[in-house]
Amino acid sequence: MSVSLSAASHLLCSSTRVSLSPAVTSSSSSPVVALSSSTSPHSLGSVASSSLFPHSSFVLQKKHPINGTSTRMISPKCAASDAAQLISAKEDIKVLLRTKFCHPILVRLGWHDAGTYNKNIEEWPLRGGANGSLRFEAELKHAANAGLLNALKLIQPLKDKYPNISYADLFQLASATAIEEAGGPDIPMKYGRVDVVAPEQCPEEGRLPDAGPPSPADHLRDVFYRMGLDDKEIVALSGAHTLGRARPDRSGWGKPETKYTKTGPGEAGGQSWTVKWLKFDNSYFKDIKEKRDDDLLVLPTDAALFEDPSFKNYAEKYAEDVAAFFKDYAEAHAKLSNLGAKFDPPEGIVIENVPEKFVAAKYSTGKKELSDSMKKKIRAEYEAIGGSPDKPLPTNYFLNIIIAIGVLVLLSTLFGGNNNSDFSGF
């Protein structure tokens, strides 16, 4: 039996809706395409993507309506990722963050996939970067990636659910969403990254930074300059250490546990850089500068940010100005996420109209004021029943005041109240 590739391509790239399901994977780097003569050419059952095939292809699975035998074939694909699936996956990632408190390890997953980029190598995928290669065991075994198998286990169910998202996009989507949901800035992301298809395409070990090299500042520049990043971007990206912990069994750095990490909703242990180590802010720079607590981690590469004159200019600025840090971090994170990537379509895919983000946790900062939008809403509801600040309800002036105060207190508690719940991580 033969099936027209052009016809299948037309079906995929038209407005016809096709159901999606994950393809069967194999350790082999060469795809095996099975054809069954008993399969009806009109019984297209599902479309699936697989790490066996380049992301310029779909795997078409055709199921017989009676005996269930299937046919697989390769057909052209329209883009590396599907925008609708990206939007849905982002919402699922928020739920994952809410339940697993895995912000740091997802940030690290995206970083380490992109951070192998070498600007001096033009050819893709030899240049490294954000290409999904970190899903292969060969790269997961690199010393710098210790522990990231846990991140892949969290991501794989999402990949199974959303087969029309590349691994490279899913890693970067998870990383950016984790920053945003921890209270950080919105990252101006684009998607459409093409995946590598075989472990032979993984970069060699040694492209990621070390925590304690002999000359920390020089080492940071060697690694990040190779990626095409500058001093400002090095310092801004280092600020992401406000999230997470170091574990001696993975990196060789940090204490087994501290007073900040011995308990929590997730796996305990490790040493954090900050007290509230799952809240994204500029605490990292403040804590390094002050060195006020032995239970907070300061690596040699962290200390270098306040020792090297060029780095220090930015570190001092970020310690004092969280808005400046957020702005520079968002730009640097977006740039990092694109390093080395091959986009399909070439201009990338921008997600728009994403639902309002879920704030994963709030830390107590004292009394909070109602937002202007909430105040307007309360006033509109009050005026709807005949009252206003200038013209109170005629029935009972003092009763109206008591009711208004009660409503304000209730809404303040519900929407702006203190919540001392903490994050945990991996």
Swiss-Prot record:
EC numbers on record: 1.11.1.11
Listed InterPro entries: Ccp1-like, Haem_peroxidase, Haem_peroxidase_sf, Peroxidase_I, Peroxidases_heam-ligand_BS
Family according to the record: Belongs to the peroxidase family. Ascorbate peroxidase subfamily.
Keywords, comma-separated and alphabetical: Calcium, Chloroplast, Heme, Hydrogen peroxide, Iron, Membrane, Metal-binding, Oxidoreductase, Peroxidase, Plastid, Potassium, Thylakoid, Transit peptide, Transmembrane, Transmembrane helix
Membrane-spanning ranges: 397-417
Any one Pfam family match given in the protein's UniProt record, by short name: peroxidase
Job of this protein: Plays a key role in hydrogen peroxide removal.
Name of the protein in its database record: L-ascorbate peroxidase T, chloroplastic
